């Protein structure tokens, strides 16, 4: 911009080569009253003394940076948690020990139940066995009587049948023989008499004829000669002898009568058999009456189980060890968390120290970026105060859109700034701290949950100890009682059934004697006759085989005449407890409280601690989730605002929506402000100015080959109304230094932004 003497006054500006003062010390030569105060020069002090914090001062505050403070808060929460958890574990330990003592008492009482039950069982067993033995003796006597009667019935049946048949056969035969002999004798005697009489008569007739013939002859001869003497036939003596022949059947008949009288009726055999059979049976019955008349089984013969005193809590340090291990686990977890958090806090200190160091070195470098990217003075303050979030927003905006002068670029930076504001980051940091706290608590919870099954297993072992003791007591009592039963069984088998065996042997011997007696009777009757073998066959068929069958049956009775008394089961007192243990794997047994099917007091003590810790973790996790969702809502609000601004069309320049102006000049290098970079007089509002082009496109000084005169004013972010925009550009004084050029007056009042504010930048 050229100097206008008409408008600028009679005094030209001081050339830059002759101006030794900095632009910060220029004064308005056209204003005699000096309405604007002059900037004070820097104090002449030690350069190490500054009103702002240097690197050493910043590093001295690293120990309470935000992340370290958050980690310390998490550490305090963990310490409080472990302290409460230790107290809860102490209470759980006391409750578990109390519950274990109760379980021990219940287990001892239950393990002693066989002591009380065995007395009643002994009385019941003794009474039952005595009644059983008495009933067995009575039944045995009745069986013996019945067997005796059956044997006698069978013997009498077969002997009587045989006797009747034999007697009828023999007597009938003898009677027939007697009648035949007597009839034959009579017939022969009558025939002999008749024959002798006929012979006698015939001989008489013949003798008479002979006598007549003699007489005749003699009469004839006597005439002639002497009489003829004929022999006389005299057979009277022979006739008399023949008549004297008498067939006497009395001897034969008498013999048959004698044989008939000698045939036995087997009454003797029957009576002998009855007498012989009655002897062993009566002997056994007498012994049974004698032995069991005063037979008693006293309950005292059975043993009594001993009382049991279980001590799986008193003499078992598992519960103590278990809870001590949990407390030790909590302590170790606290130490581990302390170490981890302290290490993280130290790392945060070192990281923040490195960040501060880098930030301090780059702070001056950011001045150029601030000059190049700041939208207005407020944006410059934001970039300076929130350098990391501002830098992140600029990087995101540049990644999204390459046009840094576009509205979208500004909206993206605005959304990122909205999401990374101090309240939003505070909420996010609380959520992160809550997540860390929940993570530490969850790790501790998982460790305790892993240890809990050991307690459940040990409680199961407690129940197993009770059941094992019950089994041992039951087994010992059953063995002792079964020994008593075995002795009683041996006595019964040796006495009572020994008598039965003796009786069966006697009966067998008696039947053998009976068989021999029958054979003797047959021999006595039929010896020397053809009927002996026939009689033996008949007797063997009718009686002998039946007697053999009876003897076989008695032999079987003899071999199996013994009793086996029932024994007591080994688990007579422990079967119920074992079944209750096997019905539910979660100890729904006699050790559980009434109404508690799957838990018991011991597990409940630890379960309460676990549930309390889990509920605390869930509650804090929900709070953390709420904080995180709050931050997400903030982020969404920022994104929605950016999207709405993105979708809303901008106002035109005539509507006061478009901004126009140059960027602020940059008088800084990597060491800070450099007066050599500031030209004496420059008009940024002049597009032809090389410095203006450099500031707009270069992002910081460096192209100052052409020094424009009077670079003392800056035009920035003015609102330009409709009209001659070149003449309506608002000019702002730079560092209390007014230009020698007059202020451009606008014919119309400016909509806004027409105030003249000291400094480089004025917010829109």
UniProtKB/Swiss-Prot annotation:
Query: Which regions face the Cytoplasmic side of the membrane?
Result: 83-149, 356-424, 646-764
Keyword Plastid in annotation: no
* Regions of this protein lying in the Extracellular compartment: 1-61, 171-334, 446-624
* Name of the featured protein: Plasma membrane fusion protein prm-1
What biological processes does GO assign it? plasma membrane fusion involved in cytogamy
* InterPro entries, A to Z: PRM1
UniProt entry tagged with the keyword Hydrolase: no
What task does this protein carry out? Involved in cell fusion during mating by stabilizing the plasma membrane fusion event.
This protein's membrane topology, according to the annotation, is:
Multi-pass membrane protein
Residue ranges, annotated region (Disordered): 653-701, 735-754
According to the UniProt record, one GO cellular component term is: mating projection tip
Organism of origin is Neurospora crassa (strain ATCC 24698 / 74-OR23-1A / CBS 708.71 / DSM 1257 / FGSC 987)
Q: Which family is this protein grouped under? A: Belongs to the PRM1 family.
Q: Which residues cross the membrane?
A: 62-82, 150-170, 335-355, 425-445, 625-645
Q: Which UniProt keywords apply?
A: Cell membrane, Conjugation, Glycoprotein, Membrane, Transmembrane, Transmembrane helix
**Where's it found, cell-wise?**
Cell membrane
Q: Which residues are glycosylated?
A: 271, 315, 479, 508, 527
